[in-house]
């Protein structure tokens, strides 16, 4: 066997060894990434649960001072959950709810915008997406004041969200009532009446404030 053939065989064996070692390393690397992802997800879930518990206590507490303190602690836990898993929309929604409870509506809107934007929104079920859209519409309407372009913009944004809610959840009576209120603000009396009638079929108590 000549020197050239020996050299070719040596190179072939070396190449095969490199491929073998590389293929063996792939599962190990994948496992390492999966382990890191699972740790991040577990940590995010832990902070999310703590935050949800704090927000629940904030809503139930009779003392305004304690309630706000608990809501701010819920925001802090939500931030930790977001840092651990930025791709999960749930902590962003929790943060928005806690901020809204604390009276910080514009930051709450920004958190909901982030939760409802891709790719984060992919983690939401249709019902969760509908809930988040409904909350965003509620905040938009709570911020409505005065007249002019700003009023029109917020009402239009709320209408868009509420129409999306009803696509995901057609029997959501609260969304129908809010949509009717938006139509009234736009001066669309007949459309508002139609939506209120639909809401009445779902739950008459939802439109008791609209009577008269």
Predicted features and spans:
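TPR alpha-solenoid repeat register
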Residues: 91, 125-126, 132, 175, ...
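Long, contiguous interaction/recruitment modules in multidomain scaffold/adaptor proteins
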Residues: 1-46, 105
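Alpha-helical segment of the N-proximal tetratricopeptide repeat
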Residues: 40-84
């Amino acid at each position: 066997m000549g020197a050239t053939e020996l050299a070719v065989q040596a190179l072939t064996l070396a190449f095969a060894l490199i491929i073998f070692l590389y293929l063996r390393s792939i599962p190990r690397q994948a496992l390492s990434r999966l382990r890191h992802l699972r740790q991040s997800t577990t940590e995010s879930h832990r902070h999310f649960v703590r935050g949800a518990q704090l927000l629940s206590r904030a809503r139930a507490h009779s003392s305004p001072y304690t309630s706000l303190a608990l809501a701010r602690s819920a925001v802090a836990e939500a931030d930790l959950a977001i840092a651990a898993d930025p791709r999960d929309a749930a902590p962003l929604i929790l943060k928005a709810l806690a901020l809204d409870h604390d009276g910080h509506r514009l930051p709450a809107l920004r958190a909901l915008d982030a939760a409802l934007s891709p790719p984060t929104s992919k983690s939401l079920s249709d019902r969760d997406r509908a809930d988040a859209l409904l909350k965003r519409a509620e905040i938009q309407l709570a911020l409505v004041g005065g007249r002019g372009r700003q009023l029109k913009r917020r009402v239009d944004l709320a209408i868009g969200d509420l129409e999306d809610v009803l696509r995901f959840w057609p029997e959501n009576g609260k969304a129908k009532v809010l949509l009717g209120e938006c139509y009234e603000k736009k001066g669309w009396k007949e459309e508002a009446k139609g939506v209120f009638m639909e809401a009445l079929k779902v739950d008459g108590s939802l439109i008791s404030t609209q009577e008269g």
